[in-house]
């Protein structure tokens, strides 16, 4: 077989014509130090603050410190495979997480990767985790109520859509339960909920997810979790990832409720990172920008103007206090950023008052504008009555004779405390709350024994649903109280058939 030189030259020409020179250009640096969730690299002179970098083993990092001869990097994943001398390259991107409807019902880590064993999340939409908060003209005032289903909150410290309301208290006082109940009450309210668990035990998060699943709340909830075994950078980034996922829905005109459980652990993780990066420590060894850490996160919660779709994101950050000290550094920072706080008192909790909300120390600075008129009219004097009861309660313990007016205040106060008690994971509809609070403030419970009040409430709801459903419908439709004659007539009719425990 003869080889023709023409064919060989034609093949060579063809290959030369199809040959393309593609240059792969990347700015790279060399790792000079790695350990404790951070790395340092030399040679990345043009790296930007917050830029994603890729290590030679595929793990990503984020630029935190820009110094004259190297950059400080937080490692977003397992840093065991990174060695001194490894190559690290710029990506030109900032950190983004997947967003959209595909995230609903899933449990993910702060990088948006699923950790629930239900397969990959099919979405192409992403959003940067750091995003500028809406400006003044892009917002509108809080005007719609966000019902938590908890009587003590909806009556005394109401929350509006777009508000930031802090839940603060010692460990084991029911902070998470209050937030989970608020999520459960958003069923059929056209709300998307995001629960961000920061440094919570995996077993605890699993229990919360099971509760949400069992009660049908995972149909509208995203869970973002960074456990205590995760590197500190992931605990630091978790709230921002959750905020980005919620913002996507807010920008599309939807309403979002986001819970950060809890920001104390995020501040601790950020302190750890800052100290390892050799940033100068300040009060309680926190870095100087720890206020900005939380303010830039919580300012992203907003009620957007109608021109931008009128969506909202309501934030419920949680802060854990030590021995009830709300004057510590992180608690005072977050109190000053938020629009009010719900203070949970350990003494009340252990004496059986649950939820253990301290009405005196709790406040809502904007939610009152969003409260429905029916709730406003029945809850108006409640806080004052409760405060005077707490004051008189301490005097009455001395056992001195009390006049009739003081005794009446004490009796009413005991019934207020009893009515505001509520079992966990059993939120009430707003019309039911209005009905029992109307009965309370109009004296219908004054003759009911304190031990009978829980039964009185449940039987009253059954009676109204069966015989006077129109009252509930009126409250829901008009947001106002029905005529007093109708309300009093229904409560008088129920009082005739209600039997005290002793009479049974």
Curated annotation (Swiss-Prot):
Gene3D superfamilies: 2.40.30.20, ATP synthase alpha/beta chain, C-terminal domain (1.20.150.20), P-loop containing nucleotide triphosphate hydrolases (3.40.50.300). GO terms for cellular component: plasma membrane; proton-transporting ATP synthase complex. GO terms for molecular function: ADP binding; ATP binding; proton-transporting ATP synthase activity, rotational mechanism. The record marks 362 as: Required for activity. SUPFAM superfamilies: C-terminal domain of alpha and beta subunits of F1 ATP synthase (SSF47917), N-terminal domain of alpha and beta subunits of F1 ATP synthase (SSF50615), P-loop containing nucleoside triphosphate hydrolases (SSF52540). It catalyses: ATP + H2O + 4 H(+)(in) = ADP + phosphate + 5 H(+)(out). The keyword Cell inner membrane does not apply. It is a peripheral membrane protein. Pfam families: ATP-synt_ab, ATP-synt_ab_C, ATP-synt_ab_N. Its main location: membrane. InterPro entries: ATP_synth_asu-like_sf, ATP_synth_asu_C, ATP_synth_asu_C_sf, ATP_synth_F1_a_nt-bd_dom, ATP_synth_F1_asu, ATPase_a/bsu_AS, ATPase_F1/V1/A1_a/bsu_N, ATPase_F1/V1/A1_a/bsu_N_sf. The keyword Ribosomal protein does not apply. Coiled coil: none annotated. Keywords: ATP synthesis, ATP-binding, Cell membrane, CF(1), Hydrogen ion transport, Ion transport, Membrane, Nucleotide-binding, Translocase, Transport. ATP binds at residues 169-176. NCBIfam families: atpA, PRK13343.1. This is ATP synthase subunit alpha. It comes from Lactiplantibacillus plantarum (strain ATCC BAA-793 / NCIMB 8826 / WCFS1) (Lactobacillus plantarum). The gene is atpA.
């Amino acid at each position: 077989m003869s080889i023709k030189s023409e064919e060989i030259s034609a093949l060579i020409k063809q290959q030369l014509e199809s040959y393309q020179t593609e240059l792969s250009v990347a700015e790279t640096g060399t790792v000079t130090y790695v350990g404790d969730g951070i790395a340092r690299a030399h040679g990345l002179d043009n790296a930007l603050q917050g830029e994603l970098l890729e290590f030679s083993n595929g793990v990503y990092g984020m630029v935190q410190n820009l110094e004259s001869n190297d950059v400080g990097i937080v490692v977003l994943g397992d840093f065991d495979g990174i060695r001194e001398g490894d190559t690290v390259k710029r990506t030109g991107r900032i950190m983004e997480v997947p967003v959209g409807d595909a995230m609903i019902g899933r449990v993910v880590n702060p990088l948006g990767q699923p950790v629930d064993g239900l397969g990959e999340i099919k979405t192409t939409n992403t959003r940067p985790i750091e995003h500028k908060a809406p400006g003044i003209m892009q917002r509108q005032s809080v005007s719609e109520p966000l019902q938590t289903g908890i009587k003590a909150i909806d009556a005394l410290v109401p929350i509006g859509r777009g508000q930031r309301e802090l839940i603060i208290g010692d460990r084991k006082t029911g902070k998470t339960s209050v937030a989970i109940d608020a999520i459960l009450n958003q069923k059929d309210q056209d709300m998307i909920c995001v629960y961000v668990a920061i440094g919570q035990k995996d077993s605890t998060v699993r229990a919360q997810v099971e509760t949400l699943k069992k009660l049908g709340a995972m149909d509208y909830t995203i869970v973002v979790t960074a456990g205590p075994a995760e590197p500190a950078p992931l605990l630091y980034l978790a709230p921002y990832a959750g905020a980005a996922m919620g913002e996507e829905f807010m920008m599309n005109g939807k309403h979002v409720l986001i819970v950060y459980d809890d920001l104390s652990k995020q501040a601790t993780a950020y302190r750890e990172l800052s100290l390892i990066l050799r940033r100068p420590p300040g009060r309680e060894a926190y870095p100087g920008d720890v206020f900005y850490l939380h303010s830039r996160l919580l300012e992203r919660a907003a009620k957007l103007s109608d021109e931008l779709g009128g969506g909202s994101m309501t934030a419920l950050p949680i802060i854990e206090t030590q021995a009830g000290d709300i004057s510590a550094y992180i608690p005072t920072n977050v109190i000053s950023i938020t629009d009010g706080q719900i203070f949970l008192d350990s003494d009340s909790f252990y004496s059986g008052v649950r939820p253990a909300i301290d009405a005196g120390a709790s406040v809502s600075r904007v939610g009152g504008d969003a409260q429905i008129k029916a709730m406003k009219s029945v809850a108006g004097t409640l806080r004052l009555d409760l405060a005077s009861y707490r004051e008189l309660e301490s005097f009455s313990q001395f056992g001195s004779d009390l006049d009739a007016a003081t005794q009446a205040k004490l009796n009413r106060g005991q019934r207020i405390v009893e009515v505001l008690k509520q079992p966990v994971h059993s939120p009430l509809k707003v019309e039911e709350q209005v009905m029992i609070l109307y009965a309370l403030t109009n004296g219908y419970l004054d003759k009911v024994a304190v031990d009978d009040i829980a039964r009185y409430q449940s039987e009253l709801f059954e009676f109204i649903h069966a015989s006077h459903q129109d009252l509930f419908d009126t409250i829901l439709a008009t947001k106002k109280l029905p005529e007093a004659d109708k309300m009093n007539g229904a409560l008088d009719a129920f009082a005739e058939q209600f039997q005290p425990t002793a009479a049974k």
